[in-house]
């Protein structure tokens, strides 16, 4: 390496990396610079030197890109929650198309150069879209603040006005910090592993109902806190306590108890209503979830004689879009609370052809096949880690005729397509901008078994 830590260098940014950073070459050394844009001439300082590349901090933009904009967020450069707010929104969508291409080029699944990559579907108003927040609580000079850890650190950045957060959820978390201060509730101490560490606030777009989870290392007295909070915000319908005594960075512990209110809030997507209990997963951008699930519906050509497996089904929201038009829908999820919600939701909607079971897809699917169940199509919506190796082998063994892969991580998607394209043809990839101003995107992939 010809560069050293703390060295200041000029740099021409040639392209954007998958995490939104600018990439340039300094005397044949690859340099990653967060905050820099393609085409810019910058001045930066080396912060880390690795075996094959270096990382740098942006000091000055000598020649700015015409696509650079001033972020409206006051904590954008310190928070780390968003990575590309300084890039004009239409160009953010182009960037996300390119991220998919970069991932495919890296992993090279069969036929990737001929894949149809459709333009990313964006939002008309890409602000205040997050219907869920998970903020950490810490004490600053005796005053309680809520926010996010700065990227790569345990330094909390207080946030009282997040540009991408739903305004009601932001107002509620601001009130919560005031009440935690007022009632002297214990704040998390990393050394003692004690106190309130995280607050989750989620709003259902269809009903404006709100649920809250207080994550604490031990039981805390919240009666007066709950009384004043629910009086100030009647939209709050559920307050739950999650016990987490772990030293790890895991947000939640295993036990969640509802302290006040109803068990679930009501949400809707594609004209289907369903219940969400506090610990169940649901997409955090309700507006774009309509778009995303609509693309899943378009991608499957199924009819009244077909059977569908909905892997990683959550509360069943994707499968319900098909339950009224197919012979059966079966789903599974490792979170038992989600399966309980899915079962209740199916019953409430009168879908007696929908069946849900708690457990791992790679264990349950072979069991169903041994019992005689044959899926014509499978939908997978895995976490960022992608498909489990055992599940990949299971899919390739049983080979449903159609498959839709919903991905929230283009790298693991491209990796999994290396295996899937041994049996399936990729008809197209349609990305949906679920997370404006971040480097992340969601993609719907239509696959058909090769004849």
Swiss-Prot record:
The keyword 4Fe-4S applies. [4Fe-4S] cluster binds at residues 73, 79, 82, 162. Coiled coil: none annotated. Its EC number is 2.1.1.-. GO terms for molecular function: 4 iron, 4 sulfur cluster binding; metal ion binding; rRNA (uridine-C5-)-methyltransferase activity. SUPFAM superfamilies: Nucleic acid-binding proteins, S-adenosyl-L-methionine-dependent methyltransferases. One of its GO terms (biological process) is rRNA base methylation. Pfam families: TRAM, tRNA_U5-meth_tr. It is an enzyme of class 2 (transferase). Disulfide bonds: none annotated. Gene3D superfamilies: 2.40.50.1070, Nucleic acid-binding proteins (2.40.50.140), Vaccinia Virus protein VP39 (3.40.50.150). Residues 2-60 form the TRAM domain. Keywords: 4Fe-4S, Iron, Iron-sulfur, Metal-binding, Methyltransferase, S-adenosyl-L-methionine, Transferase. Belongs to the class I-like SAM-binding methyltransferase superfamily. RNA M5U methyltransferase family. This is Uncharacterized RNA methyltransferase spyM18_1615.
């Amino acid at each position: 390496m010809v560069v050293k830590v703390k060295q200041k260098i000029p740099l021409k940014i040639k392209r954007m990396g998958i995490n939104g950073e600018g990439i340039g070459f300094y005397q044949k050394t690859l340099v990653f610079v967060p905050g820099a844009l393609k085409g810019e001439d910058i001045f930066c300082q080396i912060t880390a030197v690795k075996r094959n590349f270096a990382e740098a901090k942006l000091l000055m933009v000598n020649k700015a890109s015409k696509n650079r904009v001033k972020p409206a967020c006051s904590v954008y450069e310190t928070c780390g929650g968003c990575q590309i707010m300084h890039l004009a929104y239409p160009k953010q969508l182009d960037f996300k198309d390119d991220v998919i291409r970069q991932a495919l080029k890296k992993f090279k699944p069969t036929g990737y150069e001929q894949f149809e990559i459709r333009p990313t579907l964006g939002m008309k108003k890409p602000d205040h879209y997050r219907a869920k927040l998970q903020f950490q609580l810490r004490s600053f000079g005796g005053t309680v603040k809520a926010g996010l850890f700065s990227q790569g650190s345990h330094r909390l950045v207080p946030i009282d006005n997040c540009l991408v957060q739903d305004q009601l959820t932001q107002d509620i978390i601001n009130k919560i910090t005031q009440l935690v201060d007022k009632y002297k509730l214990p704040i998390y101490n990393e050394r003692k592993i004690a106190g309130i560490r995280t607050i989750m606030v989620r709003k259902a777009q269809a009903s404006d109902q709100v649920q809250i989870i207080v994550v604490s290392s031990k039981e805390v007295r919240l009666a007066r806190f709950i009384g004043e909070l629910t009086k100030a915000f009647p939209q709050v319908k559920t307050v739950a306590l999650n016990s987490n005594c772990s030293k790890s960075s895991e947000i939640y512990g295993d036990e969640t108890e509802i302290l006040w209110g109803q068990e679930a809030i009501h949400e809707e997507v594609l004209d289907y209503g369903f219940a969400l209990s506090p610990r169940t997963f649901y997409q955090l951008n309700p507006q774009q979830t309509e778009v995303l699930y609509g693309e899943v519906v378009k991608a499957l050509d199924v009819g009244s004689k077909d059977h569908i497996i909905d892997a990683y089904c959550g509360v069943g929201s994707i499968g319900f879009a098909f339950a009224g038009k197919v012979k059966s829908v079966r789903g599974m999820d490792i979170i038992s609370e989600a399966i309980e919600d899915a079962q209740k939701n199916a019953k409430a909607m009168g879908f007696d052809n929908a069946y849900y079971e708690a457990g791992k897809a790679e264990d349950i699917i072979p069991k169903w096949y041994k019992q005689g169940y044959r899926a014509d199509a499978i939908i997978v919506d895995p976490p960022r880690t992608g498909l489990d190796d055992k599940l990949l082998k299971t899919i390739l063994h049983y080979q449903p005729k159609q498959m839709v892969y919903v991905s929230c991580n283009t790298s693991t998607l491209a990796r999994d397509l290396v295996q899937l394209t041994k049996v399936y043809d990729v008809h197209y990839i349609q990305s949906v901008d679920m997370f404006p101003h971040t480097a992340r995107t969601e993609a719907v992939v239509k696959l058909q078994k090769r004849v």
